[in-house]
Amino acid sequence: MIIMAREFELKDYRNIGIMAHIDAGKTTTTERILFHTGKIHKIGETHEGASQMDWMPQEQERGITITSAATTAFWKGKRINIIDTPGHVDFTVEVERSLRVLDGAVAVLDAQSGVEPQTETVWRQATNYKVPRIVFVNKMDKAGANFDEAVKSVRTRLGGNAVPIQWNIGAESEFQGFIDLVNMEAWIFDGKAEENGQKIAIPTNLVKIAKEKRQELIDAVANYEEDIMMLALEGQDVDNETLKKAIRKATLTSEFFPAVCGSAFKNKGVKAMIDAVIDYLPSPLDVPAIEAHQGENIITVKPSDDGDFSALAFKVMTDPYVGTLTFFRVYSGILNKGSYVINSTKEKKERIGRILQMHANSRTEIEEVRTGDIAAAVGLKDTTTGDTLIGEKAKMFILEKMIFPEPVISQALEPATKAATEKLSLGLQKLSGEDPTFKTYTNEETGQTIIAGMGELHLDIIVDRLRREFGVEVNVGAPQVSYRETITATAEIEGKHIKQSGGKGQYGHVWIKFEPNHDKGFEFVDKIVGGKIPKEYIKHVQKGLEEKMEIGILAGYPLIDVKATLFDGSYHDVDSSELAYKIAASKALTDGKSKLGATLLEPIMNVDVVIPEDYFGDIMGDLSRRRGQIKETKTRSDGASTIKANVPLSEMFGYATDLRSMTAGRGNYQMIFNHYEKAPKNISDEIIKKRNFN
C-alpha cells in the first residue's frame, strides 16, 4: 500500500456548500469561484445553458440545478471542496444530503428579494446540521437591490444573526463595489471577468456610515470574544487582526453569519467572498467531532489520518461510462484504491475499484483519499445513500444515518412498447438507487408501474431521464396524491386464523391492543406471559401487522402511527405456524378498523406565493377555494405581495398554469410538504368508494 504525504494540511481544508432559493444566482456564483481559482479558464453562463456545474441536459435546458455537483478548487494555499446544490424545492433532498457532509456553507441571496421561500428551507436544514454560514447578497446591480434590507431579512425571517462585514458602494445600475469594514478600505470594480478591483480611499459621503457599521460589527462579535468586549467597554479601537479572529470565532458557533455583497454575473465581489470562505468558515478540525453508534454506545470519530478509515456515502449516481459512482466524505483515516471496506450499515464487505476526484460530471483518477476529502468510488455494489464505510480492521460502528421525507405525489407509468419493459425496470431501479425520495413499485391490483416523488417537477425529470439515459419512451398517467391511513381510537381486537379439516390444519390466535401513536410511526410491544403464544411466533405477529400496514385497511394506502401491544392469544401444538400468526395479526387490524376509527390522511403543503399587489385579492380568493389556510401575508419592499398558506396537495395540481393565467405570467410560487392531516369526510368517502379496496 502506497502512503503519500498529505498535500494540504487538514486545517487548510474547507468543505463548503453553495445554497440558495432558485434564481438567486447560486450556480453563477460557483462558476465565478471556479474561474477565479483557476479551476476553469472560461466562464459558462447558466442562462445560456453553458454552466460547468449544471451538466445534466435537463439542467442546461431549464437553467436550474437538479443534482448536487461536486468540485475542488484551490485559493491562497487552501483546498476548497465545493458542492453546488439545487434551489428548487422538489430537489431539497440534494441539499439535505450535501449539508450532512459539509463543514460550512455560503447562502446566496438575491439583493432585491432577500430571503425567499426555499432560502427558509435550506437555512433550516443547515441549522439542523449546525453548519456555519456566510451570507453572500448577490445581484447588487439588479433593480430594487438593497443590501441592508436583504441582510435584515435574514434576521427577521430566519432568526439568523447576520451582520455585514462589508458595506455596498452604490446599488442597482450604480453598484460599483464595497467597503471592507474589517480593514476600513474601499474596493471598486470595472466588471471585467478577472475582477481585479481597485483599492481606493473610502468615499467621503460614506465615511460616516462605514464607521457606524464597523462599530455595529464590533458590538456584534463582542458577545463571542471577551478581549473585544473589554476594548469596547474601555472605548478603545479594535485592530483589524483581532476583529478578524473574533469574526471567525463567532462564525464557528453557527450563531453569527458574516454578510458580504456583490454581483457574480457582473464580476464584482466574488474574490472577496472566497476570501471570507477561507477566513471565516471552518476546517474539519474546527467542527465538533462526528458521533457514531457502536453497539449501544455513542462514540466520537476524531478527524485524523492516523485513525481507522471511516466515511459516509452521501450520494449514488449512475454514470454511462463507469457504472455506479458513490460519493463519500472521509471522516478519519486513509483509503487507497483497490482496498476493501466494510459497509457497517449493511454489514457487507465491498471493494473500492477506483477513486475519482469529481468536477461536475468529469473526473480525475486518484490513488488515495484522506480525512476531510470528498470523492467518488467506483465498484461499490451494495452501498446506498446514508451508509457508513469503515476500514476492514476497524471495530464496527455506524455514523448517524440520514432521514429523508416520504414521497407525496405519484404517477402511473407504462412503457410505450413491450420491448421497453425490461429497460424501464432497469432505469427505475438505477434512478431509485440514486434518489432516496424517489420510490417505484407495482400496483398489485392494476399491475401498473407507479413512480412516487416530491413534486410534479421531480417526476417530470425522472420521466425525462428515463427517455434520455435509458432510451425508454413511456406513457404517463395523471399525478396522484399519496394519501396515508391512521387510527384515531384505542381498542383491543381479536384476530383468528383457524382452519382444521383433516390432516395438518392452521391455527393462529391473537389479542392485540391498538392505539394511535401520533408522529412516532409503528411501535410493537410484546406483553405475552406464560407462553400463551410461543416465542418463535411473536416476530411473525409483528411481521403480519407490518405487511398489512403497508397496504392499509381503508383504501390501500400505507397505515401510519400505530402502537400495537400483543397481550394475549393461544396456540395449537400441531396446527400453529408462522403463516397462521401473520394472517391472524393481519385480520385483527382489518377487522378492527371501525372500532379503531380508521381514517384517511391527506398531505398538506406549505405554499408560498409571490405576486404583484394588484392580484392579491384574486389569489387570496383562489387559495381559499382550494381549501387553503392563509398563514401570513406581507408586502415586500419592492411592492410585491407574498402569501404563505397551507393547502392540500390534491387542490394544487395544475396550479402553475392557473397562477400564470391569473397574474398575466407575473406570479410565482414554491410548494413543499408540511404534514399529514385528516381529510374531510366527503373527500375521504369519495376516495374510499373510488378505490373499492377490500
Swiss-Prot record:
UniProt domain tr-type G: residue ranges: 11-285
Listed A to Z, the keywords are: Cytoplasm, Elongation factor, GTP-binding, Nucleotide-binding, Protein biosynthesis
The keyword GTP-binding appears for this protein: yes
> Which compartments does it reside in?
Cytoplasm
Q: Which residues bind GTP?
A: 20-27, 84-88, 138-141
Single GO cellular component annotation?
A: cytoplasm
Instruction: Output the InterPro entries linked to this UniProt entry.
Output: EFG_II (IPR041095), EFG_III (IPR009022), EFG_III/V (IPR035647), EFG_IV (IPR047872), EFG_V (IPR035649), EFG_V-like (IPR000640), EFTu-like_2 (IPR004161), G_TR_CS (IPR031157)
Q: What is its main location?
A: cytoplasm
| Alphabetical GO biological process terms | ribosome disassembly
The GO terms this record gives for MF are: GTP binding; GTPase activity; translation elongation factor activity
Indicate yes or no for the key word Protein biosynthesis: yes
> What is the protein's known function?
Catalyzes the GTP-dependent ribosomal translocation step during translation elongation. During this step, the ribosome changes from the pre-translocational (PRE) to the post-translocational (POST) state as the newly formed A-site-bound peptidyl-tRNA and P-site-bound deacylated tRNA move to the P and E sites, respectively. Catalyzes the coordinated movement of the two tRNA molecules, the mRNA and conformational changes in the ribosome.
| Record family assignment | Belongs to the TRAFAC class translation factor GTPase superfamily. Classic translation factor GTPase family. EF-G/EF-2 subfamily.
Q: Which HAMAP family match?
A: EF_G_EF_2_B (MF_00054_B)
**Name of the protein described by the UniProt record:** Elongation factor G
Q: Which organism is it from?
A: Mycoplasma mobile (strain ATCC 43663 / 163K / NCTC 11711) (Mesomycoplasma mobile)
